[in-house]
């Protein structure tokens, strides 16, 4: 059971899951319930559809367990007001080599997220995988964030480099699996202490800095570019490609995409969006894809001209819509976690 890249043939994968309509009625006003419950219904349908597609493509699919809460959970120093469903496994979990890395972030609504994945990871552990976790942090509410963020141009860096600088917190979605190396946005989101924890639990020199012009070592790295084999990169434009991959064969595909439309978030749902997430970034959902193998890639939208172009290069494109991806801040790659791929550890990045 191992994973060394983002593109070796996928054998086992986790697909996130969502609450059903009515599960969160206890914290949603009567006025907003019809709209929000429809959003839950469609999100669950989309995730189930993605899981079915992956099964059709030959992967074994695992789903997290849903735990239902009926009230906020008070933990003395902070309260988990709305424990969200395990929709996005990519942010706090990484399977690299034969080890499961479990982290914590400033996202209070995902504080108990690990419970949902416990059975899956325990089975991997029983079958020989290693499983390690960051210590549980002591967080605090930031509902009055405007009082302390007014003087900072970047809330995310403020959260992790100042407010939580001494906490072990890390977003695993900052890391791109590339054989012997994890190409990483080393500034976060996540604290430098959290990065140090990752470094100490990995072989020496595994982590290499992304240094891409577009991301400047900040943000989730699983968009803007993807690879289909050891030597081929597809990207919005070269500015998203990490410096250590600039010598690969690079295909810029921005011209094939229509402008991304901002999805309108239902008014008065702001209380469901945690200001303390510490993750500010413009995300290219068009390239937040799951590479099933070097010849099959899953997108969340259909792009006929792009798909024809990729087919001419030997890559078949599949579509699994995510109708509310903007609300959940999650594309296809975000809502999945590859836990087994057929391939060996190898040197892919030549200049480190």
Predicted segments, located by residue:
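The feature marks the mature, well-folded catalytic cores of soluble enzymes
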Residues: 1-352
